[in-house]
Swiss-Prot record:
Originating species: Arabidopsis thaliana (Mouse-ear cress)
Pfam families with a match to the protein in the record: PPR, PPR_2
Keyword field: Mitochondrion, Repeat, Transit peptide
Annotated Gene3D superfamilies: Tetratricopeptide repeat domain
Family: Belongs to the PPR family. P subfamily.
Protein name: Pentatricopeptide repeat-containing protein At5g61370, mitochondrial
Residues annotated as transit peptide in the record: 1-90
Keyword Oxidoreductase among record annotations: no
C-alpha cells in the first residue's frame, strides 16, 4: 500500500514537473517572438536608411516570417511609415513565405497602400497580384478605384475594372456600383454613364445607389440641368428620390447660384424643399445648412437670419452648424452684437458646441480686428468646459501683444500656465522691446486715402496752372441774318 502511494506521488511530481517545463519553455518562446516582432517593427518604421538598407537589416533579424507577423507589422507601422517601406517589407516577406501567404494578406496590404494614396506602390503590388494569380476581393477593388480617381488616375481605375476577371474578381452589381461611385465622386459623370449603359443588366437592385452617385457627380460639376434630368429618370423608372438625392440637387443649385445668381439662392432652394415635402421628405438641418453656407459666402445677412427663424417655425431644429454659419456671416459683416446674441440663444437652448465652433469664430473675430469680442467668446468657451484651449491662447496672445495690449497678453499667458496648458507661442511676445506693434489696418487705409486725396489735389492744381487759356472764337453770323441786313 505504501509503495503504491509512493509511486502515485512520484507520478504526480513528474507530471507537474513536465507541465512546468512546458509552461516556461512556451513563455520563453513567446518572449523571443515578441522581441523579434518589436525588432522588425523598429526596422520597418525607422526613417533612417534606404529600401536596400531596410531589406539588409531584415535579413539580419533571426525571425521566421508568418502571415500573422506580416499583418501585425503592417498594422503597427501603417500610420507613420512611408508606403514604399511597407511595400519593400511585404516583398521581403513574400520571398520568404512564397505561397504560404494568403490572398487576404495581399488584399490587406493593397488597401493600406490605397489609403496612403501611393499610386506607384499600388501599381507594383497590383502587378505582383496578377503575376501570382492572386484574387482581389470586391472591397479592395472599391477602395483602389476610389483612390485612383482621387489622385487623378481615373483611366487606370477604368482599366482595372475592364480586366477584373484577370484578378479573379467578378464584374457584378457591387463592382459596377463601386466604379460608378468612384468616378462620380470627382465629377467624371460621362465616364460613369458609359459604364452604366454597358452593364445595365448587372445593376438591377442597385439603381438607387447608381442614381445617387450620378446626382452627386452632377452636383460636383454644378450642372443643374443634368441633375434635374436624373431626378426625372428616377421618377420614370418608379424610383422615389430620397433625402440624399434632394440634398445633392440642393447643393448643385446653391453652389451654381453663389456665382451666377446670389439673389436666387433662397427662392430656388425653398422650391426644392417644397418639392421634397411633396414626396413626404422633410428637409433636415443638413438641407438648410447647405443653403446657409452659400448665403454666408455671398454675405446675404438678412436672408441667413430669416432662414434660421424659418427653421425654428417649421419644426426643424437648427444644429450647431446652422448657428455657426449665421454667426460667422454676422461677424464678417460687422454685426457683432447680433452675432453674440445668437450665440447666447444657442447656449440657452441647451446646445454644447465643440471646440472647433469657438475656435473658428474667434479666428474670424481676430481677422476682422475685434479682439475684445474674441475675448468675450473665449470666456463663453471656457464656461462650457469643452477643453482644447491651447490653440485659442496661441491665437489671442500674439494678436493682443502685436496690437499693443501687452498687459492682457501677459494675463492670458499666466492663466494658461495656471491650468497647465502647453503654449506654442514664444514668451518673447510679452516683451514690448522685442514685439513689433502693428497699427490697425483701417487706420493705415484711412491714411492712404488722405495721402491719395492730397496727391490728386496737387496734380489737379498743377494741371490747372500749366493748362493754356483758350481764346473764344467770335460767333459767325448766319447767312439768313446777312440777307436780312442787306435788305
Amino acid at each position: 500500500m505504501m509503495s503504491t502511494t509512493v509511486r502515485l506521488n512520484r507520478f504526480t511530481y513528474l507530471t507537474s514537473t513536465a507541465k512546468l517545463t512546458r509552461y516556461f519553455c512556451s513563455h520563453h518562446l513567446v518572449d523571443r517572438s515578441e522581441t523579434a516582432l518589436h525588432e522588425v517593427i523598429r526596422i520597418v518604421s525607422s526613417p533612417v536608411g534606404g529600401l536596400d538598407d531596410l531589406e539588409e537589416n531584415l535579413n539580419q533579424v533571426s525571425v521566421s516570417p508568418s502571415s500573422n507577423l506580416v499583418t501585425q507589422v503592417i498594422e503597427s507601422c501603417k500610420n507613420e511609415t512611408s508606403p514604399r517601406r511597407l511595400l519593400r517589407f511585404f516583398s521581403w516577406s513574400c520571398k520568404s513565405l512564397g505561397s504560404s501567404l494568403h490572398d487576404k494578406e495581399f488584399n490587406y496590404v493593397l488597401r493600406v497602400l490605397a489609403e496612403k494614396k501611393d499610386h506607384t506602390a499600388m501599381q507594383i503590388l497590383l502587378s505582383d497580384l496578377r503575376k501570382e494569380n492572386r484574387a482581389m476581393d470586391k472591397q479592395t477593388f472599391s477602395i483602389v478605384a476610389e483612390t485612383l480617381v482621387k489622385v487623378g488616375k481615373e483611366e487606370d481605375a477604368i482599366g482595372i475594372f475592364k480586366i477584373l476577371d484577370k484578378f479573379s474578381c467578378p464584374q457584378d452589381g457591387f463592382t459596377v456600383t463601386a466604379i460608378i461611385s468612384a468616378l462620380c465622386s470627382r465629377g467624371h459623370v460621362k465616364r460613369a454613364l458609359g459604364v452604366m449603359h454597358h452593364h445595365k443588366d448587372v445593376i438591377s437592385g442597385n439603381e438607387l445607389s447608381v442614381y445617387r452617385s450620378l446626382l452627386f457627380g452632377w452636383s460636383v460639376q454644378r450642372n443643374v440641368k443634368e441633375a434635374r434630368r436624373v431626378i426625372q429618370d428616377m421618377k420614370s423608372a418608379g424610383i422615389t428620390p430620397d433625402l440624399f438625392c434632394f440634398n445633392s440637387l440642393l447643393t448643385c443649385l446653391c453652389e451654381r447660384n453663389v456665382n451666377r445668381n446670389p439673389s436666387g439662392l433662397v427662392p430656388e432652394a425653398l422650391n426644392i424643399m417644397l418639392e421634397m415635402r411633396s414626396y413626404k421628405i422633410q428637409p433636415t438641418s443638413m438641407s438648410y445648412n447647405i443653403l446657409l453656407s452659400c448665403l454666408g459666402r455671398t454675405r446675404r445677412v438678412r436672408e441667413s437670419c430669416q432662414i434660421l427663424e424659418q427653421m425654428k417655425r417649421s419644426g426643424c431644429d437648427p444644429d450647431t452648424g446652422s448657428y455657426y454659419f449665421v454667426v460667422r456671416v454676422l461677424y464678417l459683416t460687422g454685426r457683432f452684437g447680433k452675432g453674440n446674441q445668437i450665440v447666447d440663444e444657442m447656449i440657452e437652448r441647451g446646445f454644447r458646441p465643440e471646440r472647433k465652433f469657438y475656435y473658428d469664430l474667434i479666428g474670424v473675430l481676430c481677422g476682422v480686428e475685434r479682439v475684445n469680442f474674441a475675448l468675450q467668446l473665449f470666456e463663453k468657451m471656457k464656461r462650457s468646459s469643452v477643453g482644447g484651449y491651447g490653440q485659442v491662447y496661441d491665437l489671442l496672445i500674439p494678436k493682443l501683444c502685436k496690437g499693443g495690449n501687452f498687459e492682457k497678453g501677459r494675463e492670458l499667458w499666466e492663466e494658461a500656465l495656471s491650468i497647465d496648458v502647453t503654449l506654442s507661442c514664444s514668451i518673447s511676445l510679452l516683451d514690448p522691446s522685442v514685439t513689433e506693434v502693428f497699427k490697425p489696418m483701417k487706420m493705415k487705409e484711412e491714411a492712404a486715402m488722405v495721402d491719395r486725396r492730397a496727391l490728386n489735389l496737387k496734380i489737379h492744381a498743377r494741371m490747372n496752372k500749366t493748362k493754356p487759356k483758350l481764346k473764344l472764337k467770335p460767333k459767325r453770323r448766319s447767312k439768313t441774318k446777312k440777307k436780312n441786313l442787306q435788305h
